[in-house]
Every structure is written in C-alpha cells, then in structure tokens.
Amino acid sequence: CAKLGREFIRVQINPETDEDDLLGGFRLINGETVFAKGPVLKAMENGAILLLDEIDRATNKIMCLQGILEGKPVLVKKTGEVIKPADGFNVIATANTKGKGSDDGRFTAASIIDEAFLERFTVSVDQKFPSINIEKKILLKHMDKYIPSNATGDFTADELAQNLVTWADVIRRTFYDDGIDEVVSTR
C-alpha cells in the first residue's frame, strides 16, 4: 500500500468483534448521540485496502461482511444509508488456520469459519516461511533494534542473523518431520 500510495486500514479480529465494531454504531460525541462509521465503511468509501487480521479468531458475528466481500453495497441498518464500495476497495484477511480451526492445539483461539463466508475470498495464499537468504535479510533489517551498531560481543549482526536462520530452519524441518510440536516464525 505504501509503495502504491494506497490507504491501508487494519482491523484486529477477536471473538468479540461484531457488526458495531466493523460497520459502526451510535456513539456519544460532545453530548450528542451520532452514528460513527466503522473501519469497514471508511475503507469502502475511501477505496482503501482493508485487512481483517486473524479472521479465524472471529465468530459468526462477522457475517455482516458477506455482501461486502462480494463487492456489493451495504445497507447500514442503523441509519438507512447505502454505502457503495469506491474504486480500489479490497478486503484481505489473515488466518493461521484458513478458517478451519485447530485440532493440534497450536492455535487454540482459532474458530471454524462458515464455509460460505470463506468462499467469498476469491484468492487464498498459503504463505510459506521465507528462504534462508530472505529471512536473513529480514532479520538484518531489524537487527539494530536488538544489537546496537557499535556493540561488541561474540557475534557480528551478520553472524547472529545467520545462526538464527540456521537454527530456525533446523527447528522447522524437525517440526515437519513430526519430531517436535512447536515451530518458530520469523517474528
């Protein structure tokens, strides 16, 4: 979004997220009760990219998004206003379980999302871990937060990053071979 100059709106989803959180609701502002548009309506009006982060943490309280995911206008029941999506409006979502829930105990807060809801996302990408070289570049980009550039010690930032990605690769391969129950991410 930054490279394209596009507005980006992120909504962190949790089990309590509902229509009021997403579309908006009545709020007391300066002593008056007014309808305040939520992040979804703002994104629709501005043609923004809307990220529904960790959508598999949601419950059926998010079904108000079904028509929106199809690119249709939405009737705001609380005001009677119809909001049409502006050009460029897109919705993306992240989910550790692709909305299928987690039986292995790794994502205990993940919910099973209604299949009809999931089908409204026309593209699904299974994000793999980056290659060792890419992951090392990611770590080096953020290394100064953890190791000052003038620090002295047993490892240079480059050596530490290489050791971390090598260790992560061993952990991941062991995980995929069912040797351990946990895996590490780049985070």
Description of each model-found segment:
Residues 1-187:
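C-terminal regulatory/interaction module of P-loop NTP-utilizing enzymes
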